[in-house]
Design a protein with these regions (language model features):
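Walker A/P-loop
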Residues: 59-96
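Conserved C-terminal "switch" segment of AAA+ ATPases
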Residues: 44, 190, 195-272, 302, ...
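AAA+/P-loop NTPase substrate/partner-engagement loops
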Residues: 85-113
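C-terminal engagement/docking regions of AAA+ P-loop ATPases
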Residues: 23, 27, 265-349
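Conserved AAA+/SF3 P-loop NTPase catalytic/coupling segment centered on the Walker-B
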Residues: 125-150, 164, 181-188, 200-208
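Dynamic helix-loop-helix/coil hinge segments at AAA+ ATPase domain boundaries and subdomain interfaces
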Residues: 27-51
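AAA+/SF3 P-loop NTPase mechanochemical coupling elements
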Residues: 118-127, 156-173, 184-185, 190-193
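Conserved alpha-helical scaffold flanking the Walker A/P-loop in AAA+ ATPase domains
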Residues: 54, 111-130
Length: 349
């Protein structure tokens, strides 16, 4: 049998303390860098704090966003500002009815001088992609984008090409103009990590937007833009690993599962919930809820997930994954109201 001497025990204890201190300082530094990025985004996207936080949650959880809101709410600006703060490139794609899959993925170009074909990569090979008004393009174009999101690769001809490891898509939908649109099927919507709803800013925020716009015009004239610390891709990948190591109590894992199962078996909880729900969420929703709750806890400088984290991201994770019944639509019930009711019925384990 092996016995530890007091000297060896103290050495091991000291070394473990040093390792723990190093890990803790590394996590703190990563959170500090993300806090700086969050402040940069907040300075650029005024009056939308929830939008800013959820953009970072998607980045940390390695997922994609669909954003619904009226035009002019800085959706393009948000992704552009995010690209400025990251070691990443950015491309905006305006979806239109005449768009082709090759306009996204790229195409093989013929070279007459040697009779060969050379692949010209499309905009999907950028790190950050804004798919503006995704519901204006036909289904085959939407499918090309969603294949890239789900598989991290695109297929052109007989060849498959890998997309960058850092790859985030933010798709937008305009809730006002619905003529000439191609709504995404529920199975395709499920590929998005979160569905965000953004609204107009209040009067105070709009005044701040005016001042920001004037200040930027002067900055462009004077060529005096402030420098910003750029997060490297390796720092982002390290932060994602830290997020996966966030502690979640078994009781909270059970709570998440109960919330999702309640959308599939609403009759066990409440007649009202049962009458409002046509279809519930898939296991992909449970995975998304877990990843987003962990990312939120990490952003709030905690090494554990709380019930508040789960409840804070629930609406964005489930909004596009549940289907309301005809009765709910007739009563004017929204997805948000249904999810509020769901939270009131399912208790924390």
């Amino acid at each position: 049998m092996f016995y530890l001497t007091s000297t060896l025990y103290m050495m091991l204890k000291h070394n473990l303390a040093k390792i723990y201190s190093y890990i803790k300082s590394k996590v703190s530094m990563a959170i500090e860098h993300f806090s700086t990025l969050k402040q940069h985004l907040s300075d650029q996207i005024i009056g939308q704090p929830a939008f800013v936080e959820n953009l970072l949650i998607a980045l940390l959880a390695n997922g994609h966003l669909i954003v619904e809101g009226p035009p002019g709410l800085a959706k393009t600006r948000a992704v552009n500002a995010l690209a400025e703060g990251l070691e990443a490139d950015f491309h905006r794609i305006q979806f239109t009815p005449d768009l082709l899959p090759a306009d996204l993925t790229g195409t093989d170009t013929y070279r007459p001088e040697d009779g060969s074909f050379v692949f010209q990569a499309g905009p999907l090979f950028q790190n950050l992609v804004l798919a503006d008004e995704i519901n204006r393009a036909p289904a085959k174009v939407q499918s090309a984008l969603l294949e890239a999101m789900a598989e991290g690769q695109v297929t052109v001809g007989r060849k498959t090409y890998q997309l960058p490891e850092l790859f985030l898509v933010m798709a937008t939908q305009n809730p006002i103009e619905q003529e000439g649109t191609y709504p995404l099927p529920e199975a395709q919507l499920d590929r998005f990590l979160m569905h965000l709803e953004i609204n107009y800013p209040d009067a105070t925020s709009e005044l701040a937007i005016l001042k920001l716009n004037r200040g930027e015009a002067l900055t462009d004239v004077n060529h005096d833009k402030p420098t910003l610390r750029v997060l490297s891709q390796s720092e982002i990948f390290d932060a994602r690993k830290q997020v996966l190591n966030i502690h979640m109590a078994p009781s909270l894992e059970a709570y998440m599962v109960d919330l999702i199962i309640a959308t599939r078996q609403p009759e066990k909880y409440d007649d009202k919930l049962s009458s409002w729900l046509a279809y519930g969420a898939s296991p992909r929703a449970t995975i998304a809820l877990d990843r987003c709750a962990r990312a939120r806890a990490w952003l709030h400088n905690r090494d554990f997930v709380s019930p508040e984290d789960i409840q804070a991201v629930l609406h964005n994770v489930l909004r596009h994954r549940i289907i309301l019944s005809y009765q709910a639509e007739a009563e004017g019930v929204t997805s948000n109201q249904l999810l509020d009711h769901l939270l009131s019925l399912v208790a924390v384990a």
